[in-house]
Design a protein with these regions (language model features):
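Gly/Ser/Thr-rich phosphate-binding loop
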Residues: 132-135, 160-164, 174-244, 253
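Conserved AMP-binding/adenylation subdomain of ANL enzymes
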Residues: 84-113, 121-161
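Proline-aspartate-enriched helix->loop->beta-strand connector
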Residues: 19-20, 160
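Conserved donor-binding loops in enzymes that form glycosidic bonds
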Residues: 4, 75, 103, 116-117, ...
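ATP-dependent adenylate-forming carboxylate-activation enzymes
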Residues: 1-13, 27-30, 135-158, 164-172, ...
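Conserved pre-ATP/AMP-binding loop-to-beta segment of ANL
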Residues: 57-75, 82, 106-112, 118, ...
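Generic structural signal for small/hydrophobic residues in well-ordered secondary structure
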Residues: 14, 70, 90, 100, ...
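AMP-dependent adenylate-forming
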Residues: 8, 23-63, 93, 214-217, ...
Length: 428
């Protein structure tokens, strides 16, 4: 699936990589497909669904297919500006779907409330587990995520009992305190992934849903089908305490490597690495990029053993649970100290009246920048709120307050947009 709202040049880059022989479009996208002018056949979706399948041809395809064959490619942003197509196999999706359905008790009684678009890796979980178990999938209209009360009313009318959302979507309900007056009596499973879940907002949800509701923090990139590690919330957390990402999923092995490719010890930071049946085959028609992150396991010199280096910096806490720190490329050196921007975000998120926040770094001016939304906030509020949580060298140098934080198409806080907003601000 391709987002028709993407810039035409980005779509062309994807088509140049994939070189598809055919494209299926709905009526609204026919003109856009024609503009691509790349020679592929274009088929109308409405006509296809009314066409009887050719059973013999389908059977011939099934007989040739093996579980190592690709089932789809999901495109994510690339450092060169050209999207990378992550190739997943039938085996990866089947193993992952079985684990997901069994772990979170997905069955024919499950009613998913879908928040993420179908071209985002999180949709793999809900879409394929629905097919696998006979569950029901309800697509929540995007505009409702700007109106928390209407969103809750929609969820109750649809009797939604399971959600798997990005935290930004959950934050919106918590920040407006929508559950103070409106209940979600059917909701029994709350799963989240895609970005760090602010503990303050999670605690709000936990106070307002029934005591037997299951909450879980899921963690993993597109390159691991969707998830590689997870943590089912089983204890209370302070508002300024990060939620662990937990332990490896079944058929996954996760471990933490230091820069010298040795295992990180207790409380040592390192890069999260993944091996197992959830792994992607690599990036479509991009062997160079594939070879950079899908590599031989340095802990095993005896036979071929591929791992994926996620670029996520993590460590084990004193309970032996993995805790996410930041992206490898979000680490900075400031005043001689190595700093994780994610740690600053966690501290600011815990401040009273803060709804959402993001931290960026001005390398040229050596400044830590905070953007946040909230209720009647000032720079003094933020500094007073974090001074007992952060050392002086980690305190924000500049703070900007927005009515609403920008989000990308997947619902995450858009840090690239914040970087542009900041650069424009500095040019004034």
């Amino acid at each position: 699936l391709i987002d028709a709202l993407m810039p035409i040049e980005r779509i062309k880059n994807i088509f140049t990589t994939l070189r598809p022989v055919a494209v299926i479009v709905d009526e609204k996208c026919q003109k856009q497909a024609a503009k691509l002018g790349m020679g592929q056949d274009v088929y109308d979706y409405e006509q296809i669904v009314q066409t009887s399948p050719d059973a013999d041809k389908l059977q011939a395809v099934r007989e040739k297919m093996i579980d190592a064959d690709p089932v789809y490619a999901l495109f994510t942003s690339g450092s060169t500006g050209v999207p990378k197509g992550t190739v997943l196999t039938h085996l990866s999706v089947m193993k992952y779907t079985q684990w997901y359905a069994e772990t979170f008790h997905i069955d024919e009684n499950t009613v998913f409330g879908s928040q993420t678009p179908f071209y985002f890796s999180m949709s793999v979980s809900t879409m394929f587990s629905t097919i696998y178990t006979g569950a029901k999938l309800v697509v929540i209209p995007k505009q409702l995520f700007s109106f928390p009360v209407k969103l809750i009313e929609f969820m109750n009318e649809a009797r939604i009992n399971t959600i798997y959302w990005v935290p930004s979507a959950m934050n919106m309900i918590a920040n407006f305190k929508a559950l103070d007056e409106h209940r979600l009596p059917f909701l029994k499973t709350v799963l989240f992934a895609g970005e760090a879940m602010p503990t303050k907002q999670l605690n709000y949800w936990r106070r307002h849903l029934s005591a037997d509701t299951l909450y879980a923090n899921l963690f993993g990139p597109t390159e691991t089908t969707d998830i590689a590690a997870y943590y089912i919330i089983d204890r209370d957390f302070r508002d300024d305490e990060p939620i662990p990402i937990g332990h490896a999923c079944r058929n996954c092995d996760v471990f933490v490597l230091k820069e010298d490719d040795t295992l990180a010890g207790a409380d040592e930071e390192g890069e999260l690495c993944v091996r197992g049946s959830f792994l992607a085959s690599g990036y479509y028609d991009n062997p160079e990029k594939t070879g950079e992150v899908f590599v031989q396991n340095p802990l095993n010199t005896h036979y071929r053993d591929m791992i994926y280096k996620t670029g996520d910096m993590v460590k084990y806490n004193d309970r032996g649970e993995l805790v996410y720190i930041t992206r490898k490329d979000f680490q900075i050196k400031h005043q001689g100290y190595r700093i994780e921007l994610g740690e600053i975000e966690t501290a600011v998120s815990a401040v009273s009246r803060v709804y959402e926040c993001a931290c960026i770094y001005d390398l040229e001016r050596k400044l830590i920048i905070i953007y946040c939304s909230g209720q009647n906030l000032t720079s003094k509020d933020i500094l007073l709120g974090v001074r007992d949580r952060l050392p002086k060298y980690m305190l924000p140098n500049k703070m900007f307050f927005l009515e609403n934080m920008p989000h990308n198409a997947n619902g995450k806080i858009d840090k690239k947009m914040l970087q542009k907003i900041y650069e424009n601000e500095m040019q004034k």
